[in-house]
Amino acid sequence: MSLPVETRENYKYFHPIQTRWNDNDIYGHVNNVVYYAYFDTVVNMFMVDNAGFDPHNATAIGICPETHCNYHKPVAYPDRLEAGLRIGRLGNSSVRYEIAIFIYGDEEAAATGYFVHVFVDRVTRKPVTISKPIRCAMEAIVVDAVSSEFAEQ
């Protein structure tokens, strides 16, 4: 089954990513596991840039119980990329970030995926309510689930 390919217009926050030589695998393209590092980068940069999140000192942190990625076309060093970010689901203590990886200048995504965070107390690891500053930042990039590639997942 062929998935519809997401386009830039469906994402609300973008962060540049430069591929590195060691991102490539023996087959000459970015290895599948590296995409998850790209996902983590755009999510955390959004939190730092837009919610004032301090990953080193925050009392609540996001832990990741679930990720997923669909690969649409290969990416390889030295491609310059942009990661697009939106929020597909925002709960009391959890959020599902939806991410697309674009080769710089391309309208269609090379890869799409999602990344779930559950916010927990840094020490106890018990779920906590998403703080107001973080929630406000997240609400600005929430999308209608109907338009999401991952709406049924």
Tell what function each PLM region has.
Residues W21, D25, A58, V123-R125:
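Residue-level signal for pocket-adjacent positions within structured domains
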Residues S2-M45, D49, Q153:
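Catalytic strand-loop segment that frames the active site of acyl-thioester-processing enzymes
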Residues G28, A37, I61-G62, E108, ...:
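Residues that recognize and position ribonucleotide moieties
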Residues D23, H29-N32, P65, K73, ...:
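Generic structural "secondary-structure junction" signal
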Residues P16-R20, N70, V116:
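Generic structural detector for well-ordered beta-strands
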Residues M1-Y13, V75-Y77, G88-Q153:
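HotDog/MaoC-like acyl-thioester-processing domains
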Residues F46-V95, A109-A110:
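Hydrophobic beta-strand-centered segment that forms part of the acyl-chain substrate-binding groove
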